[in-house]
Amino acid sequence: NGVIQTELARLAVEHQVYLLAGSIPLKSAIMDKYYNAALMYAPDGNLLCAYNKIHLFKFNDGVVAYDEGVNFVAGDKVICCEIDGFKVGLSICYDLRFPELFRVMGVVDVILLPSAFTYQTGLAHWELLARARAVENQCYFVAVNQGGEHESGRKTYGHSLICDPWGEVLASCA
């Protein structure tokens, strides 16, 4: 229950919304390692559920390299929660590439995926994979992706979208 979590809970209460925040680094039991977490707050400010990212991102194209496992430890539990009678599955970023994670959720109404896909990987696979997960699981799929250029020079793709169970994009924004 740190400063960020307290503020997220306050915002959920103030706006009377369910609030998914992710990803947020949370300390793990392993020294100097964190979980990459998505936290779902209810309108009363209580933490409804938390998901620790299972699939850690590792990328090296000879020019750019990144290994999430240097700082993070993988979660080991698939998490779903109920919101106003709807079963909601949680996932984070690179999890999108692993369809078996979503199948283990069982029947869900919607899957939420906060993400920071790189420009390169997003351009190649972002919409394709989000639409595929919606179709495979016959549910709505909300994929929120950070976009822009960071101080480090890293570029994220953006292009957040909502897909229906047929794989149609209902809404998107850059």
Regions picked out by a protein language model, each given a short descriptive name:
Residues L26-A29, E149:
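Short glycine/acidic-enriched loop and turn motifs that connect beta-strands
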